[in-house]
Amino acid sequence: MGDWSFLGEFLEEVHKHSTVVGKVWLTVLFIFRMLVLGTAAGPLWGDEQSDFMCDTQQPGCENVCYDKAFPISHVRFWVLQIIFVSTPSLVYMGHAMHTVRMEEKRKMKEAEREAQEMKNSGDTYYQQKCPVAEKTELSCWDESGGKIILRGSLLNTYVYSILIRTAMEIAFIVGQYILYGIFLETLYICQRAPCPHPVNCYVSRPTEKNVFIIFMLAVAVLSLFLSLAELYHLGWKKAKERCSRAYKPSPSTAPRRLESAPQVERAQMYTPPPDFNQCLASPNGKFISPFSNKMASQQNTANFATERVHSQEDAAGEGPFMKSSYMESPEVASECAAPALPESYFNEKRRFSKASRASSKARSDDLSV
């Protein structure tokens, strides 16, 4: 029957990159077709022509009757059926291997470009850890839960291969029925030149051959059913994915409060600068903002005191103002806190200059009586 190892190796590679139904179909092809055909069908049909006997002595009549009864041997017909049915899967395997190689080359180029960029930037750690980009086996499918997801042109090639092998199965089943029918007859009447009259011819082991023919027809029908089931499986799976994608809510419709939550957490993770605590420390040991309401209240008090001094100066004159004493304000622990007002500031009648009218701090040229 020949060596089937070459075809078997290719079909093993196809088995790695097939769906669940496709793996069952390949198992049926291996066990119930190739194995049975190679072990049982060969010896059964080996003596077919030699045991085909006709009751005539006319030279050549027996040969032309056998040619009319069996235009092609059953075994050779089934071998052609296996080859034609397996060819679409082999084409798909070639496309898959080509896609894998192209993906490997693309990944290799990206790794080499990244290595060159890191080398130019002078990253010694990257040069020590990743000196050369290694070639790794990549896959064009994502495995989630043990299932293989086909995409893009690879999915189209896989679907076309299933359609072609389904058409081949139907064609060979119909062709076998047209050539031989369903069962072999024990007696075959031949009317063909150079036979001078109708000749009776006899087929060897017709019952055993009929059992084998029925078995091969059943396997062909099973393979056809598996191909249709695989098409339905792929179609239902893709339709389900599209429906789930259509009913899936878009990110724009999500509540905004959920989006702002991570931003608050990110803001809390930022650390302040080193000198930030000095501006927040107050004499009482509490943390206040440098622009708090207390500081604004002190500034308003200073402005009110300045206006009060002006009003008292207009009423009483400049005499009492020269008798007042001015005391320096104590140092403030915080650099950002507002200085405290002196106790005698509210009784002071000294006229302020235009430059110092807006400020309450003591100057170096102020008089002290």
Swiss-Prot record:
Mostly in heart, and in the whole embryo, liver, stomach, and pectoral muscle. Residues 347-369 are annotated as: Disordered. The chain crosses the membrane at residues 20-40, 77-97, 170-190, 211-231. GO terms for molecular function: gap junction channel activity involved in atrial cardiac muscle cell-AV node cell electrical coupling. One of its GO terms (biological process) is heart development. InterPro entries: Connexin, Connexin40, Connexin_C, Connexin_CCC, Connexin_CS, Connexin_N, Connexin_N_sf, Cx40_C. GO terms for cellular component: connexin complex. Its main location: membrane. Keywords: Cell junction, Cell membrane, Gap junction, Membrane, Transmembrane, Transmembrane helix. It is a multi-pass membrane protein. Residues 2-19, 98-169, 232-369 are cytoplasmic. It is found in: Cell membrane; Cell junction, Gap junction. The keyword Transmembrane helix applies. PROSITE patterns: CONNEXINS_1, CONNEXINS_2. Residues 41-76, 191-210 are extracellular. Belongs to the connexin family. Alpha-type (group II) subfamily. One gap junction consists of a cluster of closely packed pairs of transmembrane channels, the connexons, through which materials of low MW diffuse from one cell to a neighboring cell. A connexon is composed of a hexamer of connexins. This is Gap junction alpha-5 protein. It comes from Gallus gallus.
